[in-house]
């Protein structure tokens, strides 16, 4: 059955983990409307207000740490996401078993199909079977990544393995495939609509990619390999955040000569007293990368911060080896060829061509960005001044970026006339940005975000906000659970998780106890899409005046961009309301799924949008436009280097998944990584084994180029529809009705041809790839 993994934006902290430039603000003199009382803003900015609204879930959370409290799950109004089974980890097991039994009944029903009348509903029956499986698998993916209860997490892993294996078994069920082939062959007679036919073809591709036409022993081997890949992949993901060592030893003599005494005083020494134990996580190593003048110290710290354990490299090697074996088993030359079938890019050659088209121009731009830092380095170290791009790239190392960038940023701040000591984030509290997103969506799509109080037991943490998505015509069209605040043990990587897809109700579907149901303007019921947005924003204490202080989340521009990105996925899930769940929302081609989210980044960088949503947390005044424009210019610091980093990661993903042999010991992932870094030669890393920390190698195997590909597409759509007016309802409707609402139910190349008014794109050929790759600016 068709599956789509959760989508998210992983900020890889190789070079771009921390903003170097602290910008100051000046507010417009004209008073603005005080928006402090707006309900959406208030539930995110006023924690005491939220605690009062959600007191039952806070009380529940407190009782878990006491001997007395809620006595049993019967005291809960509901379970997670209003699924009554999900009141406990044991309830997840029961829900999995319930779904398994339901899936068995559906398979038996499908296997017994004989008449043409029964065949008419076959694709919908398959979609229902997929829905039953995916609602467990997607749920478990979310729980094991986010839930604070370890028992819940462990149970989710077990339930995921069970249902994932069942899904792979069904993907090799010959009877199911034969019936689908017959159904598609007789589609005209059966009266299937275009969405059913599209869904059927996608499902048939899934069967074929599972070796359905192979011998039984090969199909069994496919199931085994798929299961092993799933398990080792999750193990790989779970360990990407860990460094190789928690500290490194650097001599006291060297450190004392080049590091601020205050920083040194915060570090322990080893038993000999001759070496500092420099931590490789937390703020100290980042501080040293920004402030330490000695390149040897910076190199050692940077390398350890970006290195993982040997065991993690073994996990990655095993993952790649298993994928090669699976691809070979099913007749493909390599995993990239196997994986790209059915994607927009179609072949590894097309992907490589697209990436190479970006390399030359982006390298030149990156070298130009690095030149001032390289000149500064040459002046401070007494080396020859670099003039050519090659000389700049030869001189600059990845551990130089933060140090020389900080010096340059400090000089800029000292010469700036805008410095009043207050961060620009004062105008962008989390509540302000959420309200701004709602206002933007109302203008361009006709929908708004409305806060709702969750029932007791509905969320996994009391600080999770439930947000209802309301359409101006259809009313409630979806539900978002916003888990946006930092929490101990929580993943730092922002993500969008699909918990439940939008779809029409199935024929004779009576039991709706485990789903949330909506009713459209025509009175038709449908399964509400349910998603979770996960971020890790930090609380700070702010001065509200008159001696009052309050905890609040104030967002930097990169964090605003993150939130807009994830909200782009959310809008795709909410607006992609198809008949069938297999093609709803983000269930589309992997190299198309990032488009709506990356387009939202353009809105997040637009001065007009940011100015319209800004509101100082205390005064309510909007941010001065000129200050914002200056800040936007400063915020572009090394943006082409960041793009080139994405190119390098995309190439790494392709090179690892283009391997076509699995001889024991023949895959040296570190050597491949270092060779690639040296070839591409922008801030090259030939010291660490960072490839083992690149988590997207699992979730986006052979498809990481999608970020750059969709960046290029988003740039063209922005220029075509929103550059002149980001609040234009006509063009917003064109994007909504021409692309978002179809989810994966139409060919993405056709959808692009419609929204870009370029009919030739519908073919999805080499010309189309060149057209998309020809992006001069804006990526």
Swiss-Prot record:
InterPro entries named in the record: M3A_MIP, MetalloPept_cat_dom_sf, Neurolysin/TOP_dom2, Pept_M3A_M3B, Pept_M3A_M3B_dom
Keywords: Hydrolase, Metal-binding, Metalloprotease, Mitochondrion, Protease, Transit peptide, Zinc
One of the protein's GO biological processes: protein processing involved in protein targeting to mitochondrion
Cofactor(s) recorded in Swiss-Prot or TrEMBL: Zn(2+)
Cellular component GO terms held in the UniProt record: mitochondrial matrix
Top enzyme category: hydrolase
A Pfam family hit: Peptidase_M3
Gene Ontology molecular function: metal ion binding; metalloendopeptidase activity
Transit sequence range: 1-27
Residues the record marks as active site: 566
Known role: Cleaves proteins, imported into the mitochondrion, to their mature size. While most mitochondrial precursor proteins are processed to the mature form in one step by mitochondrial processing peptidase (MPP), the sequential cleavage by MIP of an octapeptide after initial processing by MPP is a required step for a subgroup of nuclear-encoded precursor proteins destined for the matrix or the inner membrane.
Family statement: Belongs to the peptidase M3 family.
Protein name, UniProt field: Mitochondrial intermediate peptidase
Species in which this protein is naturally found: Kluyveromyces lactis (strain ATCC 8585 / CBS 2359 / DSM 70799 / NBRC 1267 / NRRL Y-1140 / WM37) (Yeast)
